[in-house]
Every structure is written in structure tokens, then in C-alpha cells.
A protein has these predicted regions:
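Short amphipathic alpha-helical coupling elements at transmembrane boundaries
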Residues: 93, 108, 123, 168, ...
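Hydrophobic alpha-helical transmembrane segments of integral membrane proteins
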Residues: 279-326
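Helical transmembrane-bundle signal
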Residues: 168, 272, 305-308, 337
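Hydrophobic alpha-helical transmembrane segments in multi-pass membrane proteins
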Residues: 118-290, 354-378
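C-terminal regulatory/interaction regions
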Residues: 315, 319-378
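Membrane-interface helix/helix-cap signal primarily in integral membrane proteins
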Residues: 1-132, 353
Length: 378
């Protein structure tokens, strides 16, 4: 399910002219009639796509038509889909004891579910440039893979990588195949294969390979704003994060804490710079407080996310333990919300940008990227 509706695969259909069986294609339904992977039987009408932008977006998903259901019976998911549904249900139950906004943020960080966000909070996150925190992507994949590899450090390399690959697959099932998730997962697979073969994985090559493979397998991703932002942010981090970090370290000096601050600053500025043209052209606004908000909020994200993951997983076998993990995550969630509230609710938090300025930014970022690549090759 997404903002365009729920994509459903048809395996059987009956109408006045006859009955059909097999892989019949996909249709788009309004809302989310059940957990992902749930089978359903419905009566309704197939509707052709309209000519408006919303219908065009639905068409680009590869669906054949819209489906307006008048009656629907939804079953329970089976197999791995059932496991994923259990983990999602556990995550939702574990945050019931938290303050509502903190619980909604936890679900956004862990499984990408932002349905609990109120309009004010959602707007604050957008204006403060923090919306990417609740769009599950590379950082979440890194946390999952890192945790599995560390916990399995005593195992053989092939077994550790196999467990990490399995955990990555389950993670994608739980959060859903969103564009940013697919990009991050594909890069994770490339990195795991490189480790298995004993080779070093170059981030830029991994990003290019992941982007090409995903675009070939799911051509509709090229129309996805989430995919554009995910690829652009990752490319920006690869190209400019180190240079930005070193620049700040020259100003504030060296040291472990200062190096950590420099790394956080570098990642934040590099990603913000890379996605700025896309945000300007699509939304017509840019966050003024984004770099500062990210610098303040991002340090709390790993702990809030890890504790949220632990709550979701342990909740499937021991609810009290999940409650403890959720309770421990509350201060970190509260800090992120505080940053969003104070840096995202003012009129000056974002600025309107004209299309001409957006294209100028696109040229600037492109030239900077090409220049960086040329300098690295010399």
C-alpha cells in the first residue's frame, strides 16, 4: 500500500464474457484492505485510468486498471508474509504505552508506517527536512545488517553472510518494497556478495549496479519520487560526505567526538545538497533549517531505531520485554520530535523556490558531481 493505493495481483477473474485463470496482471485499489500478501475475494468494477496526474501515477506502477470493490473478503497472509505481518503487529502493540506522537514516530522509523502522524507533525518534519527519517532506507538496512553481522561474529563468514541476507529479506518483507527500501536492499546484497567473494565493494559502483538492476526489474521505479530522492541522497553522501567532514574538522579541530560531529555534518550536508534540486522542482520549497535539524536529530535515530526493532521482534515472544525496549526508546523519540517542533514549525523553516532556481540548482549539483568524479580519477 502507498499514497497511490494498494497494488493487487489478479489470479482469477469472472465477468459476463467468461472466467479467467492465471497471472492476469495487477490492479490498484483504494486504501489498504488487508496486510500485504493477504489473499482476497472481491466483487466490483474495473475502471480505466483517467487523464489526471493521480491516475497517471497509478498507471506508471504497471497496473492495468483501477478496481472499485463493492464487496470484499480478506484472508490472512501465509508463509513469510504471515511472519512479516506478525512483526508489524508486534511493533504497533509495543508503542501503545508511549505518547501518541512518539509511538507514531517509532513506527515510522522501524517499519515506515506514518499513518499515525497528525498533520502538524508531518508538516514540521517536512519543513525541518526530517521526512527522510521515516522513509525506511539505507540507514535502516545498515542497522539490520550490522546487528546481524556483529551478533554472528563467532560464526563462519559464509554462515554470517547467509544470516545477514535472510535478515535483509525478512526486513524488506516487513517494511514493504518501497523504492528507497529496494535501493538500499540491492546495495546491501552487492556488499554481502563482495564480502563473500573477499572483494572490496566500491559504494559508487554498488549504487550504479543496484540502480540499473532495479530499473530493469521494475521500470516503473524511474517515475518514483522516493527512488529519485534515495539515489540522489546516497550519491551525494558517496561524493561529498568525506570532504564536508574534513572541512568541518579543520575548523573545530581533531578528536574522537569532533570527528564524529564532522562525519554527521558531512553526511547531512552532502545528502541535503544532492536532493535540493529535486525538492525544489517537485515541491517548490527548500528547508532552511534542514542541515541544523538533521545534525541535531540524526544522532538519536540509531538508538531509537534499534530499540524499536528490538521491541517489534521481542514482542512476538515476550510482550513485557518489548515494553521495556519501547520505554527505553522514548527519550530518543522525544528528542527527535523536539527538534522537528522547534525547527519545523516557524514560517521561516522553509523558503519558496522558483522553477528557474530549481533548474539552476540541478546544473550546479551536476557540475559539482562531474568535477568531483574527474578530480578523483586524476
Amino acid at each position: 500500500a502507498g499514497s497511490l493505493g494498494t497494488s493487487a495481483s489478479l489470479s482469477a477473474a469472472s465477468c459476463e464474457i467468461g472466467s479467467f485463470q492465471g497471472e492476469l496482471g495487477t490492479v490498484i485499489l483504494d486504501g489498504a484492505p488487508g496486510e500485504p500478501g493477504s489473499p482476497f475475494r472481491a466483487t466490483g468494477y474495473f475502471l480505466p485510468f483517467g487523464s489526471d496526474g493521480f491516475s497517471a501515477g497509478r498507471r506508471r506502477t504497471g497496473a492495468l486498471a483501477e478496481f472499485d470493490a463493492t464487496q470484499m473478503e480478506v484472508g490472512d497472509p501465509a508463509g513469510l508474509d504471515r511472519l512479516a505481518a506478525t512483526v508489524r503487529a508486534s511493533a504497533r502493540r509495543s508503542v501503545e504505552g508511549l505518547e501518541p506522537r512518539a509511538g507514531a514516530l517509532s513506527l515510522g522509523l522501524v517499519i515506515g508506517d506514518t499513518s499515525g502522524f497528525d498533520v502538524g507533525t508531518e508538516g514540521s518534519f517536512r519543513r525541518a527536512g526530517l521526512s527522510h527519517l521515516v522513509a525506511v532506507s539505507g540507514s535502516n538496512v545498515a542497522i539490520v545488517l550490522g546487528a546481524v553481522l556483529i551478533l554472528g561474529s563467532r560464526l563462519s563468514v559464509p554462515l554470517r553472510l547467509s544470516l545477514a541476507g535472510a535478515a535483509l529479506g525478512i526486513f524488506v518483507l516487513v517494511v514493504g518494497p518501497e523504492p528507497s527500501v529496494l535501493r538500499a536492499a540491492a546495495m546491501g546484497v552487492v556488499a554481502l556478495l563482495a564480502l563473500l567473494l573477499g572483494r572490496r565493494s566500491e559504494p559508487l559502483q554498488a549504487l550504479c549496479l543496484a540502480t540499473m538492476v532495479l530499473s530493469a526489474l521494475r521500470p516503473t521505479l524511474v517515475f518514483s519520487l522516493g527512488f529519485w530522492l534515495s539515489v540522489a541522497a546516497t550519491l551525494g553522501i558517496i561524493l561529498w560526505a568525506s570532504a564536508a567532514s574534513r572541512s568541518l574538522e579543520r575548523i573545530i579541530g581533531s578528536g574522537r567526538k569532533r570527528a564524529w560531529l564532522g562525519a554527521a555534518f558531512g553526511v547531512t550536508c552532502a545528502a541535503q545538497f544532492a536532493v535540493a534540486p529535486i525538492l525544489a522542482l517537485v515541491f517548490g520549497t527548500l528547508s532552511v533549517t534542514g542541515p541544523l535539524a538533521n545534525l541535531l536529530a540524526v544522532p538519536a535515530v540509531p538508538l531509537a531505531t534499534i530499540l524499536g526493532f528490538l521491541a517489534a521482534v521481542t514482542g512476538t515472544i515476550a510482550a513485557p520485554l518489548a515494553d521495556v525496549c519501547a520505554f527505553l526508546s522514548a527519550p530518543f523519540l522525544g528528542w527527535i520530535l523536539w527538534v522537528a517542533d522547534h525547527l519545523g514549525r516557524s514560517d521561516w523553516s522553509d523558503a519558496a523556490v522558483s522553477p528557474h532556481a530549481g533548474w539552476a540548482l540541478m546544473v550546479l549539483v551536476t557540475v559539482a558531481g562531474v568535477t568531483t568524479l574527474c578530480v578523483r580519477r586524476t
